[in-house]
Every structure is written in C-alpha cells, then in structure tokens.
Amino acid sequence: MTTRRDPFAPRPRGARPAARSSLTLPPSARRPLTRRSAMLGAAGLMGLGLAACGSSGDGGGAGGGGESGGGTITLGYIPSWTDGLSTAYLMDNRLTAMGYTVEHEPITEAGVLYAGLAQGDVDMFPSAWPEVTHASYMEEYGDSIEDLVAYYEGAVLNLSVPEYVDITSIDELAGQADRFGGRIVGIEPGAGLTEATQDRVIPGYGLEDFELVTSSTTAMITELESAIDAEEDIVVTLWSPFWAMPVYSMKALEDPEGHFGEPEALHHLGREGFAEDFPDAAEWIAQATLSDEQFGSLEDMVVNQFDEGEEAEAVEAWLEENPDVLPPVEGE
C-alpha cells in the first residue's frame, strides 16, 4: 500500500531538470515584467524576477527556437497547484522525446505567471484556467498569449467540507460562522479562486460573518488535514480536478446561485509566437487531451504514488500504463 506523502514539502531537485530562479512577488504584481525593469530591482525586486531567465534564441521568447523539433522550451507553473505540476512533467517527457530541451520555471502567483508568459519570459503555461478563474488575467495579457489547446473539460471551483459535515450547499453556511470558527480557509491571495470567493460567493450567499483566510495551498491542506484528524468542522476553497478531493473525502458544496461560474476547460497556453517557433511541439500539443479518468490517474501517480523529486519517474510509469492516451511521438 502506498503511503500518502505531503506533495507541498520542499521538493529536492534529484533528477528533475535544472529549475530556474523561482519568482516570489506579491499578488499586486499584475503588470508585465520586463527583464530590464526586474533586473534593475525596481521596488526591491532585484534578483528575484523572471529577468534572470534571459533569452537564449532567435525566437524572442524564453527559449527561442525557430527550427522544427529543436530549441529550448521553458515551462512556467505553480508547483503547489498539482494540475500544473503533473502536466509540466508530462510535457517535459513528451517534448524531450521530440528533441526539445525543457527547462522549468516554478512561480508562486498566477498573475505573475501570466505576465511572464505575455512577456515571453516563459514559453508555456502547461495547465491554465483562462475561461473563468483567470479571465481577468486573460483580459490583461491575452493579446500576447497563444491558446494551444483545451486539454481537459469540466474543471470547477468550489467550497468544500469533509464528508462528515452535515451540509450540502453553500447557502446552508449562512448563519453558521461560529460553527466553523468564522473562517473559510483559502489558498494564495492572488488566485482566481480567492477572487471569486471574496468578490462573488461571500456577498452572494450572505457570508459576511466569515473571514476568508488566505495564505497558500500548502497551508490550507495542512489545516484541512489537522481538522479532519480531529473531526472538526472546516470549510475550505477547493477545485476539481484536484487530488485532495478524493484523498480527504471532501464534499463540494452545491452552488445554486452559480457564483463560482460555469465549469471550464483547462488549457495549455503558450507565449506569442510559440507555434511559429516550435511547430512540432504546437502540432503535438494541439492533439494532447485527457479525460477525467486519465487526468485523475496522472495526478494521482505524480502526487501520491511516487516520492518527492520523482515526478519524472511518475510520468514514465503513467505513460507505461497508458501507452495509447496521447498522440505518438515520431521515432519512438
């Protein structure tokens, strides 16, 4: 039996590709970041930004390219959001098999990731929520971003409680703040899920007696696990697909007013010029879609079935078990 690990603990590099400097900016940093302005250290950002990535090719982006089946592709993603972590290593495996060099750029905030993608500091965002959750970022940066494919259909945001909590709908939370300690435990302050909860769900359902506590996905999972161990009432912001929903037997509360929005697709996004610079990659990515069952098995393999630092090995194992899910790579 596999022991569940903490997927958010510091991840040793092991055999993973050399990661570039992680960007740790506040959620207010929603403007495009030029390499020059970040490098000069405006507002105390010297040495922290995507400026460190540089440009290594003629394509004008992070990796450049311009030749079929070659070049360097930089993947930008938020490691604690495991849809992005899982698909980043899946893309790494397949793109490497196609002859590309793949680099990883872990980033802590969605707004900064979209800005970096629009600026060309990263080449690809492997698992984005552009239709609803990150619509505001697409409005700001979408003109400089290429939509490569909608790879998964039916993603949703929610408020969730452990299965032992006897409520089934968000509207049942009204008037019960004391029962939950007056708190909804959230994730990163710059997340689209946080914005939707604060701006639409709380006022829409009359939950002003609750405080939305934001920190990180890591902290939310830690607090959730502690509450479940003690069988305490807790309500958290979650989403699906996400490994924690089945692992912790979470119950997504119904959203009768639809304040979280309609189900949306998850997309692979590229910087402007991605398809021109990496035509083989773009053609393959456009055909690479996953069903709910396929995505769930991939994320479970990466997060729960393998140890930290073994994401590449997890993807190899998943591909061995699912050889016909993705389009073939020429020469394999």
Which functions belong to the PLM regions below?
Residues G116, V122-P126, A196-G258:
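Ligand-binding pocket segment of bilobal, Venus flytrap-like solute-binding proteins
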Residues M1-L33, L40-A51:
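N-terminal secretory signal peptides
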Residues L90-M98, G181-E211:
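Ligand-binding cleft/hinge of the Venus flytrap
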Residues G69-D83, Y100-E105, G181-V185, I285:
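Short, well-ordered beta-strand elements
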Residues D143-G190:
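A conserved helix-loop-strand patch within extracytoplasmic ligand-binding domains
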Residues C53-E67:
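Bacterial lipoprotein signal-peptidase II cleavage site
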Residues Y151-L157, A244-D292:
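Periplasmic-binding protein-like
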Residues I73, D83-G84, D199-E231, P263-A265, ...:
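An extracytoplasmic/periplasmic, membrane-proximal ligand-sensing/linker region
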